[in-house]
C-alpha cells in the first residue's frame, strides 16, 4: 500500500476488536463523573495558535517543538489542540459561564495532538478525558478530584498498580523566588548538565527538576527545595489537601521534583503513575491553575483539573488482565436459520426478543450458508449460545438453544418462552 493510503505515523486506527474495552472505560468514567455532578463540554479540536502560546507558554517543549500548526486560507495560524485545559478556559470565557463567581464542574473527552516520537503509550494523536473546575479555591475540591480518580481505579481494578505523587508549586511569586535560587545553583554547575537541561535552564528552569538524565539528577540532590520557598497560603492549602487524603485513606508520596510540563500550574500538582508501562508511567495528571483565566484575558478565576490518557489506561487494563469477560465477548447469542421460511420467522422472533431483553447482544446470521458454516460463524463470534431454527423447529414452533462454551445439552425452547429462557441463562448469568 502506498504511503499516502496509510495512517499517519503515531496516529492509530482503533479497530473493532479494541473498541469494546475503550467504550467500557469511557462509559465507566462518564458515569462516575455524572454521579459526582460534573457536566460535559465539547470544544473544537482546532484553535487559534495564540491560545496555546498564551496559556501553555511560548518557551515550553509543547509550543516550541510539538504542536501541529498551520495557516488556513485566511492566513490565520491554527493549531490542533495539544491539550484540553486551554480550550476549555477559552470556551468558558467566550460564553461567560464563570462570570459572577459561578461554579462550573466540567469534563470533556477527545483527541489531542503532539508531534512527539511515537512509542508504546505515547502517540501523535492520543485521547484524553479531562476535568476542569472553576471558582472553587479550597483544598476540598483538589481532594475531590483525587478521591474521584481513586474511586475510578477501584472500579477498574487497577488500584494496586498506580501510585499518587503530590507536590505544591506555590504562588507565582513564591515560584519566582525559587526559580532564581535554582538558576543560581545550577548555573554554578553548568558543565555538569546535559545539553538539553542547559537549554531548559535558560528557557524554563523548573523543567530541569523532572529530567531523566542521570548526571543531572545527581546534581539536583543538593539543589534548593521548592518546599522551602512556599508562601504561607500555599503551605496551608497543601496541608489541607493532605489531611483530606489521609481522612479518605488514600496513600500518596510527596515528590518535590514534580513540576508538570505546563507553565500555568500553581499550588497543587499531582500525578498518578504506574510501573507497569515502562517509560510512559503517568496515566493521569493535573493540578491547580488559579492565574490562567486572568492570564487569558478574563477576571481572576480559580481553576483546578486533571487529564487522563485513555490509550495508557486501556493498555494498563490489558496488561493487568482487567478486561471484564463480557467486554472481551462481543456477542451473547448467535442465531442460525436454515431456509427462507426460517429466516423470515427468525426476523420476527429476534425482534421480539430484542424488545423484551434490550441488553442482550443477539446476532443473526446473514448470508445464509450450510449448517456447518453457520455454526462455525456462531462459534467464532464468541457467543455463549447458538440458536438453531430449521424446518423441524419451525414446524414445532420451537428453537434450539445450544451452549457453545462449557458443558450442556441442546434444548428446544418454545418461541414464547425464549426471552425468559435467555434472561435466566445469559442476561442474569
Curated annotation (Swiss-Prot):
SUPFAM superfamilies (alphabetical): Class II aaRS ABD-related, Class II aaRS and biotin synthetases
Any one GO biological process: histidyl-tRNA aminoacylation
GO molecular function ontology, one term from the record: ATP binding
The keyword GTP-binding belongs to this UniProt entry's keyword annotation: no
Main location: cytoplasm
Protein's cellular compartments: Cytoplasm
Keywords in alphabetical order: Aminoacyl-tRNA synthetase, ATP-binding, Cytoplasm, Ligase, Nucleotide-binding, Protein biosynthesis
Entry GO CC: cytoplasm
EC numbers, comma separated: 6.1.1.21
A Pfam family this chain is assigned to: tRNA-synt_His
InterPro entries: aa-tRNA-synth_II, aa-tRNA-synth_II/BPL/LPL, Anticodon-bd, Anticodon-bd_dom_sf, His-tRNA-ligase, HisRS-like_core, HisRS/HisZ
Residue ranges the record marks as coiled coil: none
Enzyme class, first EC level, given as a word: ligase
NCBIfam families cross-referenced by the UniProt entry: hisS
PANTHER family named in the record: HISTIDINE--TRNA LIGASE, MITOCHONDRIAL-RELATED, HISTIDYL-TRNA SYNTHETASE
Similarity field: Belongs to the class-II aminoacyl-tRNA synthetase family.
The protein's name in its UniProt record: Histidine--tRNA ligase
Species: Pseudomonas savastanoi pv. phaseolicola (strain 1448A / Race 6) (Pseudomonas syringae pv. phaseolicola (strain 1448A / Race 6))
